[in-house]
Amino acid sequence: MRHLLSVTDLDRTAATELLDEAERFEQALLGREVHKLPTLRGRTVMTVFYENSTRTRVSFEVAGKWMSADVINVSASSSSVSKGESLRDTALTLHAAGADALIVRHPASGAAHQIARWMDGWARESGRSHGPAIVNAGDGMHEHPTQALLDALTLRQRLGDIEGKRVVIVGDILHSRVARSNVFLLHTLGAEVVLVAPRTLLPVGVQSWPARVSHHLDAELPGADAVLMLRVQAERMNGGFFPSAREYSVNYGLSERRLALLAEHAVVMHPGPMLRGMEIASAVADSPQAAVLQQVTNGVHLRMAVLFRLLVGAQEAIA
């Protein structure tokens, strides 16, 4: 695996191996007073975020540091990007500065794929076996593969297996890269996926996705093994998608009443940040069925696994 750009690059075996690797890292860190492994000593990981992030950026940073990598955070607002530098020049500059891996978040769909093409082209032209590994940390409304992987890891830990489970994804499907990645990864892992949203928040072509579409949340909750709530991405909207926040919450928010419709074993998830009181009630977000903080913890271990596979390979042992 040279890059991680899309969940569609992973078959069931590859995805399962990453989940297994993440759990091995979790076990390797248990009982250690200092969370530090020498696995990536001497490697340089750079995070390049053109959009704001807390969970993804921090967890990649922690993942790299726990494996002894040198981690450098590049903020678009404080770099030469703010002076008009192109994405290509920024990527090549960071590579020339010694990056072994670039973790990229960008508002344009396909940005990480383009950087990977530039890096692979540079490697061919220079006669090298490869350039830096590229990880897609979110590209516009397209994909967020590591989020889908950590969600799958959380589901596996809570439910025992993903095969045959029903996962209901609720909310702003239209603008959600998390929804897209989850739909395709969960399908690969054998889950049944149901999308619940108002018609205005469904993308064109959603009928071709491996998921069933519904507009009635109450009808879908009793048979769900897991519910993944999505934030309404107001920053990507210009109005007119639904009448009001209150009406949206009434129709598509996960309230205490709706929580009671779920089976006792069902898991409630959210990729964050949560809009408490809109798509999810505080009492639900803080309930025993909620796995929101477990998702964050799993994000570190999963991203350790991704960096390990990209920079070391599957045959090496975890130190």
Curated annotation (Swiss-Prot):
What Gene3D superfamilies is this protein classified in?
Aspartate/ornithine carbamoyltransferase
**Which organism's genome codes for this protein?**
Nocardia farcinica (strain IFM 10152)
List the catalytic activities from the record: carbamoyl phosphate + L-aspartate = N-carbamoyl-L-aspartate + phosphate + H(+)
Question: Which keywords appear in this protein's UniProt record, sorted alphabetically?
Answer: Pyrimidine biosynthesis, Transferase
Question: Residues that bind carbamoyl phosphate, according to the entry?
Answer: 55-56, 105, 144, 147, 272-273
Family per similarity comment: Belongs to the aspartate/ornithine carbamoyltransferase superfamily. ATCase family.
Pathway in which the depicted protein is active: Pyrimidine metabolism; UMP biosynthesis via de novo pathway; (S)-dihydroorotate from bicarbonate: step 2/3
Q: What PROSITE patterns does the record tag this protein with?
A: CARBAMOYLTRANSFERASE (PS00097)
The record's annotation in SUPFAM superfamilies points to:
Aspartate/ornithine carbamoyltransferase
Subunit comment: Heterododecamer (2C3:3R2) of six catalytic PyrB chains organized as two trimers (C3), and six regulatory PyrI chains organized as three dimers (R2).
Protein's name in the database: Aspartate carbamoyltransferase catalytic subunit
Chain positions recorded as L-aspartate binding sites: 83, 177, 231
Under Enzyme Commission nomenclature, its number is 2.1.3.2
A biological process term (GO) from this entry: amino acid metabolic process
- GO CC annotation terms, alphabetical: cytosol
The molecular function GO annotations come to: amino acid binding; aspartate carbamoyltransferase activity
So what does this one do?
A: Catalyzes the condensation of carbamoyl phosphate and aspartate to form carbamoyl aspartate and inorganic phosphate, the committed step in the de novo pyrimidine nucleotide biosynthesis pathway.
Primary gene name: pyrB
Keyword check for Transferase: yes
